[in-house]
Amino acid sequence: TDVIKNFENNLTEHAGFLVLKGNFFSSAIMKTSVISDEFKKRYLSNPKNPNLFICKAVVFEGPEDYHKRINSKKLNVNENSILVIRGCGPIGYPGSAEVVNMQPPDRLLKKGINALPTLGDGRQSGTSESPSILHVSPESAAGGDLGIIKTGDKIKIDLNKRRVDVLISNSEFKKRRSKRKIKPLNNQTPWQELSRLIVGQLEDGACIKTRSMYTNIVEKKGTPRHSHWLGEKYWYII
């Protein structure tokens, strides 16, 4: 019966999200409410630099690629890896996929390592217990620099400064940007095409871009027309 808690009797004192910035995106959030004791001990408890850690990126091009390769020994995924997924934002994956909360490979799970740092331009379920860095904006399909991150890159996460930075030089940034080619989008339905045209990034709520033009509709433009109204004298026979 004691499900809804008040402020004085909370489940967790410091919970919620952190809003992050970085040198390869303008905005992201981290679900700090689900940081486990295991995760905190492994990544956030360095006495010299608490809440700061550096991991090597392992990059996946969407959920299909993740499921296909996560258990490959060639990736050499270990507890110092950060799993990165892209192509999952509102443009790359209309609706934005709930896929950022990736599990470690089976061999790490068997060792008791139940969570690795993860990062991506998609979403995750509200019930997920993964402390992912998600909603990376702009997404890779919109030209965001998440698209130039490579497997093996070192990524520095500093929760004290609310920053996530890839540790490459400015010249390397420019080189990768100049060589990058964004893959053409594959619209499987007209609704996907429409969504990609009018929906913004997750940092803005993935809302319709022209939404601000349609406030106080009745005052500005009158009551919208009813699509089934013929007048009081008419009745429908079904």
Per-region residue spans from a language model:
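Catalytic or ion-coupling anion/metal-binding cores of large enzyme and transporter domains
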Residues: 1-139, 144-238
